[in-house]
Amino acid sequence: MFELILSGFAAVFADPMSIAMVFLGVMVGIIFGALPGLTVVAGLSMFLPVTYVMASNVGLSMLTAIYIGGTSGGLISAILLNIPGTPASIATTFEGAPMAKKGLAGKALGLGVFASLIGTLVGVIVMTLLSPTLAILTLKFGPWEYFSVTFFALTLISALTGKSIVKGLLSALFGMMFATIGLSPIDSAKRYTFGSLQLTSGFHLLVVLVGLYAISEVFSTASAKQQPVKVLSYKMKGLGFTLHDLKGNWGNLLRSSLVGLGIGILPGIGGSTSNIIAYSVAKNSSKHPEKFGTGIPDGIIASESSNNASIGGAMIPLLTLGIPGDGATAILLGGFMLHGMVPGPLLFQQNGDLVYNIFGSMMLGTIFMAVLMWAGMRMFVQILKVPTHILVPLIVVLCSIGAYALGNRVFDMWGLLLFGVIGLMMSR
């Protein structure tokens, strides 16, 4: 196994295109994570069509890099705007914003990046070591086990529906109905085409994903009342912190990373929950819980290490069982399918080289994330000031180009609009 892991890492570091796309993916992810309203899921959805023309290893490496960068990028707006860039950074605002108001924004940002680095490393390392072992176990699955896994995946709808299970089940029903449009895979019989030649091909998976996640987010952002962005000033020298700032927090760092990893493995939860739980655990374990909420490093370290560790955790059920751990891995599932692969028990057997290549690219993406965040913090902070009326049209145009490029059909662009409206209605 270790030989395969090393070969996968070597393949990534020896491929300039993979390195370039991982670098670009991390940068894109940080930008989407930092901008409130444009989540990592929207970023993945938007760039999923871009990977269509890439080699499988390069395209999937770019998507995982966006995942890593987007999860970490949320800390920037959480600290400087007191607005979490992603749901996974909610707990970061509890301590980050008070520290920024004290004039310690640079230290808060530096500690957040360091915690993100350690958390992601823990998650990726455990994923790399644990996934192949679980894959060997899942290869022994028979019909009963496959049925159980499929049934379990369907029951996850109840965990992902928020307060209304009925709405979630109806959404699943509509999803399955849309999936039946087109030609039957068994006898090529036309289903629900209503005489339309365009509907014969059905709705492309990418059109559905980009519409539901990216276009709907754009509509939501555009329809919301925009307030002038006030970014708190900050000074950040070097890494932004010293080893003395980590005194007494090494245990918190490791514990929170493990909390995020464990919660990430549980499908349907992910970083949006792990950061809150890790923050609560850190507060209850602290000798001075009354200081939490006043602006101390402990809360930032707990939140950012846990939400980034959940990345590796969420990837484990995706790769070994084909069950996405959160919304971002659901998009990655679409990425695998786009490139002709189905995550699950046979993935390691049929595409083992690619999987280990992804492991290597995620490790490289983790390093790029830390370097870019520390070195390019000033640039990312300036991006927070970009007006919404510039961002929204740009994103719509890029998404439309990606949808049209799939099959050179204007119909796919109309499908993008349709599912964007559906996604907006579902979010309301």
Regions found by a protein language model. Give the residues of each.
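Transmembrane alpha-helix interface/packing and boundary motifs in multi-pass membrane proteins
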Residues: 26-40, 70-82, 157-162, 258-269, ...
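Short helix-coil transition sites and intra-membrane helix breaks within transmembrane domains
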Residues: 31-41, 79-90, 122-126, 263-272, ...
